[in-house]
Amino acid sequence: MLKDTFTLWNLNNPWRLGAVVAYYAVLSLPGFLIVVINSVGAFWGREIVQGEITQQISEAIGPDAAKSVVEIIENSRNSDKNLFATIIGIIVLVFGATGVFYQLQISMNEIWSVKVDPKAGIWKVIKDRALSLAFVMVIAFLLIVSFIASTALTVLSGFLSRLWEPALVYLAQIFEFGLSTAVLGLLFVLIFRFMPDMKIQWSSVWLGGFMTSIMFNLGKILLSFYFGAANPNSAYGAAGSVVLILLWVSYSCLILFFGAAFTRIYTEKYEVEIHPQDFAMKVEIEEVVVEKGCDNPPEEEEKK
């Protein structure tokens, strides 16, 4: 099954899909961060949330990228606007925050070989944007849960360290890794369930979602080591932080798309037959070779 998963994953050119999502992730970053920080900050405190996000980014891709993200947040907040400009700004902010999920949905549809019916019209676009906004809010909710749990675990680790029980401290760290895997797994389950325009059952997405979560957490650790040792942003000067964000999102998408391919293979092998949504259609892409080079024997046509 892993062989079939890799074949499907590679067939859909995940590097291209990851690059597209990474590009839109950078464009969506200001709106996404402001929406999440304001949403979670209403319960937890904006400065605390911003500090936690900055710390996570610093651990994942380095302090330079984290500093750039802080500047993006501050610049988005400090712009002086009148009432009309503020309303337009909010609309643009929400539209920008949902852009990366909209592109992610398009990529998921490619992996599932499904396409939106052109007759679906504007209501399909509105529905997709609403779904993307819902995912932003889901992430905000999961961040609240994660912050509460992380705070509790930090207090617990400090208490255990004072007892001079290193094994218990390591146990708390393992539990924190498991908690992170569970939270991310739930997010990936929701992505695999609702993002593709397919009628997918809940039973089809649990294994793929949590497998992707484990790979994502392990990949995050490996990427942090790579970024720390190789320092790939040094060759790009002032644009280095943006390049790091692009690389991190692109590499993360490779894992996400592998999980999506696994979910499709698993569903087609073990679950009931699934069908596209009412506004979508299943597609098959066929390559037709109409001409070969001179070194190849002449053939009229070859289909793959």
Where are these regions (language model features)?
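Membrane-embedded alpha-helices and immediately adjacent juxtamembrane helical segments
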Residues: 1-304
